[in-house]
Amino acid sequence: MATSSFNINELVASHGDKGLLATALVDKTAHEQLEEQLQHQRRGRKVYIRNVLGVKDSEVIRNRYGGKYDLHLTQQEFAPHGLAGVLRLCETLDCLDSFPSSGLRQDLVLDFGGSWVTHYLRGHNVHCCSPCLGIRDKMRHAERLMNMRKIILNDPQQFDGRQPDFCTQPAEDCKVQAHFAISIHGGYDMGFRGLCEAMNAHGTTILKGTMMFDGAMMFDDQGVIPELNCQWRKIRSAFSETEDVTPLSGKLNSTVFSRVRKFKTMVAFDFINESTMSYVHDWENIKSFLTDQTYSYRGMTYGIERCVIHAGIMTYKIIGVPGMCPPELIRHCIWFPSIKDYVGLKIPASQDLVEWKTVRILMSTLRETEEIAMRCYNDKKAWMEQFKVILGVLSAKSSTIVINGMSMQSGERIDINDYHHIGFAILLHTKMKYEQLGKMYDMWNASSISKWFAALTRPLRVFFSSVVHALFPTLRPREEKEFLIKLSTFVTFNEECSFDGGEEWDVISSAAYVATQAVTDGKILAAQKAEKLAEKLAQPVIEVSDSPEASSQTPDDTAEVCGKEREVSELDSLSAQTRSPITRVAERATAMLEYAAYEKQLHDTTVSNLKRIWNMAGGDDKRNSLEGNLKFVFDTYFTVDPMVNIHFSTGRWMRPVPEGVVYSVGYNERGLGPKSDGELYIVNSECVICNSESLSTVTRSLQAPTGTISQVDGVAGCGKTTAIKSIFEPSTDMIVTANKKSAQDVRMALFKSSDSKEACTFVRTADSVLLNECPTVSRVLVDEVVLLHFGQLCAVMSKLKAVRAICFGDSEQIAFSSRDASFDMRFSKIIPDETSDADTTFRSPQDVVPLVRLMATKALPKGTHSKYTKWVSQSKVTRSVTSRAIVSVTLVDLDSSRFYITMTQADKASLISRAKEMNLPKTFWNERIKTVHESQGISEDHVTLVRLKSTKCDLFKQFSYCLVALTRHKVTFRYEYCGVLNGDLIAECVARA
């Protein structure tokens, strides 16, 4: 498994505006923390989330589903109540994952009220019951039809022969039978019992569903679900939120109200600060999911189990069982955590004090207000004076106060309509308490009774008091009016479930039957897969003929055009090949799919970054104009990406374009793509070469190759290029390299030219092979193969129809690494069929051999096998390595005869700036200053490694990077460094040599 790692400075320089966020992570623990996050993401299927989510919303979705799915938040588009939409998608996948996904008819899943187009596009084995209950449902159907057409037009081969599976009937009327069902926010209009009856009609035994949940609905008339930014409110009419004053006779005679649910309490769900459609549902149906537990219907007993309540969403399951159900007490609780700090206070709701209502007040506010009211009470004062005192204290405890110029919220604001009634209720409560306490004191202080009662011993007093209260209840003190009510933080529901459904359900026999059927179905599926694979492998391999006529008759030659997908049936797709019983075919197909997904994510990230810059500069997706503070925005982004720029419609650039740089694409309101000189658009560093989407598309259109992959794993300088030169046959071979520099080196070695037609025909980069027309060959020779993703290597073999690939590379040097730190890279490492080693170097001088051995001993884990522990050198140079400390970049000796390498882009930029200050030729700082990663595969006589900072850099601890740095030279190597860097592997080994 490949490990995804990255350097913070490279991240900042390559990720556009995201680099602004990354700079905050540059500290001593940043690398470890990000690695932990990557490990956390390595699980489950990938789920791409297009909706723009804030930081809090992103945390909600990651906390809920980040452990199950590999979530990719592309932040591409704004959507109404974005988090709710994202949760709905993940809830759908989560509920479907509870059931078998064989694709067989017996494993069909029903979806009550879901989106059929979601299942169609993802290929789910689901039948959707999507009834048209009103204009909203019909609007949704029209929109789904449009979305389906749009997506099919972009990829018709994928959906060829596939039909959407849905009906427009209510769930209880649909005749499709299935054992399993889901209901994603579809139970509001059916209720618990309605869902059970629908399950019975379909023969469904298990249903998983979700719904918005707030336990406070049992207590309050309105509230907020903060995670969803949703406000709910109980209303009395389907058309108005105020009480309907139409006379009863008028309602009964009204043709309008005869069609709506009259006299029922509805719950309206409104999304705060979003002027979008709300959802209105029957409170009785919603309440049933909170209170009901079992329901017996037509020989089946259905029980609901509330599984998870998170972020205002409750996941539940309903399971139906046949036969008799012995009596059993079923108990569950609905909790109200939001009211644990509150107390109920009864206040008058009418002037005659007959009607009262209960309001919630913070316990701290009421306690302090009542305490002051009791201490300041005086029965000789007018009631209004005492009323004003209470109102003043109540206001101070529930309003905004200013302290030292800072405004602070004290307590919680009270409804303006309840404020005076609350104060009046507290006054009545205080007066009543004083009157009752006075009566109690007078009764206790009565002369004859109190003296006689006091003369009794304590046991007699207790006994006498109990007898009197039991025999003469009217002698008790008058019961006080209940003003204060303690609010319970939960409510309990107990139900005795008992049902006589006839014969007892034989669970043991059912288990045996299910196991037998599952084995039979599994064998059928395996046989089908093996048969399809055998048919595929039975096709003969088409060898390349020397005859031009024979070559022209190759079936796919005329169809292979850059960017065009071949028509591959669903059964022959990469996805099908990943399930191949032939291990290497499955491995290669999986790697190709990962490579295609990786390139697609790079493209999506580029689009997301550019769209964000465009929007911040005042642009939108409709007009070709920018209206923001362009200089401020682009100066900010320029600090992390010097290639960020604006091309105006006049043809002028905001900043001078670096010499030799040509932007192939740009971004504006029409998206990312080629632009004309008369357009306004923006660019960044990813717009110079933007081929990720094309690479992804081409790779997905290919099939995993079945040819042999051989790897020559040689040490640095073992003569890999010489070996390629010696075995290359122009009639049957093509040479493929990982990058343009390696291709130029091989062309010079073979053809003494880097740009001749012959050299460019036979020596090409992997990207060039995939993106352009190329002849088919029987063998491909690959240089520096470790810099390629395994999936890209397989795609190259498939495109060239090669039956053999001979790959040269060093498995211990810098391997392919992801440019997107968030991508879960698992299958990038080359998996060869044959491997051979070469442990003799002809390039590295004699003193480099023990240095590399020492580095391997110090850097690699104990027990790790390394070919560098036994490598030898045939070089005649005996001493080549030196080092010296420098104070700054000005002391670096820049000489045109030397090749300069750095570990980081920042140090490289400093050296280039220094070279420009010294007026050195452009060819020097363009070709003679590279990073270690860029210099892999390069061979030079004199090399200088420069480190200009002593801040933490993990690259100096990695054996692969240090190995490449120390093995580029033939004659001399000089290490020039500023300050002491802890863990500097090269400095430690050079010092001990």
Curated annotation (Swiss-Prot):
It is found in: Host endoplasmic reticulum membrane. Residues 544-575 are annotated as: Disordered. Residues 712-975 are annotated as: ATP-dependent helicase. It is a peripheral membrane protein. GO terms for biological process: methylation; mRNA modification; RNA processing. Residues 839-993 form the (+)RNA virus helicase C-terminal domain. GO terms for cellular component: host cell endoplasmic reticulum membrane; membrane. Belongs to the bromoviridae replication protein 1a family. Interacts with RNA-directed RNA polymerase 2a. This is Replication protein 1a. It comes from Cucumber mosaic virus (strain Iizuka). The lineage of its organism: Viruses, Riboviria, Orthornavirae, Kitrinoviricota, Alsuviricetes.
